[in-house]
A protein has these predicted regions:
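Short beta-strand/turn micro-motifs composed of small residues
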Residues: 26, 55, 147
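Non-catalytic substrate-recognition/targeting regions of SAM-dependent transferases
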Residues: 3-16, 32-101, 110
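Short histidine-centered catalytic/ligand-binding loop motif
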Residues: 23-32
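Rossmann-like S-adenosyl-L-methionine
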Residues: 74-216
Length: 216
């Protein structure tokens, strides 16, 4: 991650580097006015193959900004492979989550190493399998990756093949809340459970619903 919003003193701006390509998101009007300059600076510093604008954030509408998905410099392939810790991961910058991949969780994925060996792992809200693949590579006996998106699970399976762990990674397409209740009723047990749900509260008005969701 090249720029991480407030953490780097640039609220509303995220810039991620995937192999030799960059992807960015702008969430506020102030930085939108500096977009062309931003692209010029990124191109000068990194000399990337391409830079992709992933400005399809719903929050942009609150600032009167359009939804944009476009290559704004060079060329960006439909898919590319990145290296994250011991894993290789397929990334689709144009249609993947956020800027193409949840890079903000890469440190946590690396922290699975001492906990995964020999365990049966349940990865809830797995998206494209970042946690699942790392758990398998770190020696998990089995990994069940669960997500409501079959498109995301298809990428989990491809990532499992890419990393040589397809024999220990299975996928389940289901609503996580429903499946968790079902598994609890069945008395299923896992040595390691990972849950990385989407944001429940994207605005103050959603707080009550978020509290209910987290409790559930």
């Amino acid at each position: 991650r090249v720029v991480f919003r407030e953490s780097d003193g640039l609220p509303g701006l995220t810039v991620d580097k995937f192999a030799d390509c960059l992807s960015f998101q702008i969430a506020c009007l102030g930085l939108e006015q500096w977009k062309e300059t931003l692209v010029e600076i990124l191109a000068e510093i990194f000399a990337p193959r391409g830079i992709y604008e992933r400005d399809d954030l719903p929050v942009r509408e609150k600032e009167g900004l359009p939804q944009i998905k476009a290559c704004v410099y060079g060329t960006v392939p439909e898919e590319l492979i990145i290296r994250e810790h011991d894993a290789r991961m397929l990334v689709c910058i144009e249609n993947g989550q956020k800027t193409g991949h949840f890079l903000d969780q890469q440190e946590n994925r690396g922290r699975l190493k001492p906990y995964a060996p020999g365990q049966d792992v349940l990865d809830l809200c797995c998206c494209t399998g970042g946690f699942s693949i790392h758990a398998a590579l770190y020696g998990a006996a089995s990994v069940e990756a669960v997500d409501v998106s079959e498109e995301a699970l298809a990428l989990v399976r491809r990532n499992a093949e890419l990393n040589g762990v397809a024999d220990r990674v299975t996928t389940t397409c289901a609503n996580v809340f429903d499946l968790a209740r079902q598994y609890a009723a069945e008395g299923r047990q896992y040595g390691l459970v990972i849950c990385d749900p989407p944001a429940f509260a994207k605005s103050r008005s959603a707080l009550d619903g978020a509290y209910r969701g987290y409790r559930e």
